[in-house]
Amino acid sequence: MYSMYSSFKAFGVLLRLGVALFLPLLGGGCGYERLEDRACPPEGTALRWEPFGKEYLRRYCQGCHAEGARAEGHGVPAGYDFGTHEVVLARRERIFARAAGSNTTMPPGPYDPPAEEREKLAEWLACGAP
């Protein structure tokens, strides 16, 4: 029984990971926005890691993208634990491609950020995620 449960759990993790990784490819260019195409406003941004970035990631991302999430079976690839500003800076382009502005493949599920929050995330990332 244990091996069957483990197999189903592994299949579920792989299925979620596959959908998360390949769903953007199915849409082609429809709605996909790139970080390099989004300009920081001329006046810059008032958004900062604390409180905006850290709180946004805690609320919408760290349920899966946090230290220990992989151990809980979420299937998050190594290097995508968004608990520190340094990791977020290193993954800025990828975060933008999946969750900012008109990009809505992350987070999966019913707890999507409102469009206004995604726009703030886009601005923050486009301005270098200060």
Where are these regions (language model features)?
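Aromatic- and Gly/Pro-enriched helix-to-coil junctions and flexible linker segments
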Residues: G28-P130
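Sec-dependent bacterial lipoprotein signal peptides
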Residues: M1-G28
